[in-house]
Amino acid sequence: MIEVARLYRVDNISSVKAFVDVVIGQVLVKGIRIVEGKNGLFAGMPKSQGKDGKWYDTVRILDDELKQELQDRILEAYNV
């Protein structure tokens, strides 16, 4: 089960529109970004910057069905 625990909208000119925390089962994932991309809105997983200056995902959803469900729930909550 996926639950949107918190959604914080960002009012600026950045492509990041909001930050979201979600609960997946007994796991809380903080810092998911809702981003306006070339093809519309999408959910970007939390990232951290490595010592090499590159950004790396800190959470990766391996199951495509779960990933799509997560994206759908997040965007549904954002569009309410």
Regions found by a protein language model. Give the residues of each.
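Single-stranded nucleic acid-binding surfaces, predominantly the OB-fold ssDNA-binding core
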Residues: M1-V80
